[in-house]
């Protein structure tokens, strides 16, 4: 596990290395996405690796879809991690042999304590959501629009400005959650408690 944390830290080193700039890159292609949601203060438009320097809208939309999806997953992960750290557990047993939810440790240690059938159920549940529910709806209002006529929460009642504001908030909170869950995992491996 320490190797995984070390590898992720080593890989993140590239985020701080200067990106090579092509002499042929024009200002027009570099600024193709400067007015997109997410290109906001304090960084503005930021693409240090030049992933969409060619101005390809389809590629940008795919990367945005992945960013939103991972942000949503990480927001749930941070909430779940903090809930467990606060000592909140489901009542009862996790299996028929008497393993209680209370006996399952927090964080990475839970992977070895949860029965194999439980891990299989988690993977099947995630797979079902990936295939059936959390897919980008073709022709949706925006990239990452997972509305499927089951859950709406009144989205259509908002004004266009309010929708843009809420999408920007979600994007920023998703970015923060991606950094947050990584920080929580690193703190766990370092043996540092996150709660007083």
Curated annotation (Swiss-Prot):
The UniProt entry, under SUPFAM superfamilies, shows: Chlorophyll a-b binding protein
Query: Transit peptide boundaries, per UniProt?
Result: 1-31
The reply on keyword Transmembrane helix is yes
User: Its domain of life?
Assistant: Eukaryota
Tell me if Chloroplast is a UniProt keyword of this record: yes
Query: What UniProt keywords are attached to this protein's entry?
Result: Chlorophyll, Chloroplast, Chromophore, Light-harvesting polypeptide, Membrane, Photosynthesis, Photosystem II, Plastid, Thylakoid, Transit peptide, Transmembrane, Transmembrane helix
Any Pfam family: Chloroa_b-bind
**According to its record, how does it sit in the membrane?**
Multi-pass membrane protein
Query: Which compartment or compartments is the protein found in?
Result: Plastid, Chloroplast thylakoid membrane
**What biological processes does GO assign it?**
photosynthesis, light harvesting
Which Gene3D superfamilies does this entry report, sorted A to Z? Answer: Chlorophyll a/b binding protein domain
Q: Where are the transmembrane segments?
A: 73-94, 114-134, 174-196
Molecular function terms from GO: chlorophyll binding
User: Which cellular component, as a GO term, is one annotated location?
Assistant: photosystem II
Which InterPro entries is this protein grouped with? Chloro_AB-bd_pln (IPR001344), Chloroa_b-bind (IPR022796)
Give the record's subunit note: The LHC complex of chromophytic algae is composed of fucoxanthin, chlorophyll A and C bound non-covalently by fucoxanthin chlorophyll proteins (FCPs). The ratio of the pigments in LHC; fucoxanthin: chlorophyll C: chlorophyll A; (0.6-1): (0.1-0.3): (1).
Q: Which family does it belong to?
A: Belongs to the fucoxanthin chlorophyll protein family.
What's its job?
The light-harvesting complex (LHC) functions as a light receptor, it captures and delivers excitation energy to photosystems with which it is closely associated. Energy is transferred from the carotenoid and chlorophyll C (or B) to chlorophyll A and the photosynthetic reaction centers where it is used to synthesize ATP and reducing power.
Q: What is this protein called?
A: Fucoxanthin-chlorophyll a-c binding protein A, chloroplastic
